[in-house]
Amino acid sequence: RTAQLLCIYIRTMAPNVKIILGGPGLSHNGLHGVNMGAEWQELKLCDHWVKSEGEHPIIDIMEGDYISTPEWTQIKNLDEFPIPVYDSYDWSLYRGGIPITGSRGCVRKCTFCDIHTHWKKFVWRSGKSIADEMIAQSTKHGVYDFAFTDSLINGSMKAYKEMCNVLRDYNSTAENPLTWRGQFIFRPRNQMPEDIWKLSKEAGLAQTYIGIESLDEGVRDHMRKKFSNDDVIYGVKAMNKYGIEGTFLMIVGYVTDTEETIKNQKEMFEVLSPYAGTSITKVAVGSTLAILPGTPLASMAEDLGITLGTNENDWVGLSNQTTRLQWRQDLIEHCVKLGYNVPEHVGHDQMMTSGSVINV
């Protein structure tokens, strides 16, 4: 709705300005909902729309040789493009630093997520190219904080370590060391040993947004998250040791959730409570589980005995929406009593954009 109002305002105040809409989320109700671009072009609220990646289409648009289409081919080599030019930006008007993209897609295939129906392959830039862009932009604009737009900043550990090594070396002598934040996954100790956590801090990692989703291992296994509660404890302790802030992103009312799994989550929050306000800076409890079109859960619904409703949150399986909303409220109240900072209602995208200019 906000985007629509902005387009109407631009059309009214500056009718000669060209409006281009784009991105993987150019739709209502998930990646596979109604095509918002085609709808708004028909309403004359935009001149062009680009489904997903815009590096090649923007050139075609400038040359007058582009037809908006839902068909597109994913770019495999993200290192082939020059870094963004922000010369027209007044960075004093923005909070949270400069957005940067190091990868597209995701290494996980979570059951509730539709990203793999869009980004078929996880692709990433070299770690050096990411670090070089951050150094160049900070030198040019005098902005020293960066917000990653990636689904995961540590999806490729090879690229992640390479980036951290370059940034650590730069920060060790820089007058204004760089800091950065982004969405993150907890990995087992053998995949991310303590020396990598130390390196991350020295490289400028300030804040992580971690898709925990559930602190019940059985629920999380069904989600295909691929990390254990021991991995969570290890990661939280490492962040605490090196002064890295973390926001837990939670989903309440998964398809396998029961009173017992909610109880297990409460107990795990009790175990982690010594880190409330330190390495666990916030616990973001979003809406109850939404089953979006194009997700594995949507295709598994019949086998799981789920009846889909008129919207993505209104489904019936082991639980109904009334029960899930009560679980959510109970979990929030429990976390608050334990000393966690729990925003009243914050979704994943809002957590990432609070204090930044990025969208995920």
What are these model-predicted stretches?
Residues E245, E260-V360:
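C-terminal accessory regions of radical SAM enzymes
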Residues R1-G142:
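Acidic, low-complexity intrinsically disordered segments
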Residues R11-N16, R168-P177, Y242, P274-S279:
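Short helix-capping segments at alpha-helix termini
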Residues I20-L21, V50, R181, T247, ...:
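Structural detector of well-ordered beta-strand residues that form the stable sheet scaffold
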Residues P82-G246, V252-Y254, E267:
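Radical SAM [4Fe-4S] cluster-binding motif and immediate context
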Residues G25, S151-G155, I185, V252-T256, ...:
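Short, solvent-exposed turn/loop segments enriched in Gly/Ser/Thr/Pro and often Arg
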Residues G33, G37-W40, I196, T256-V271:
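Catalytic cores of alpha/beta
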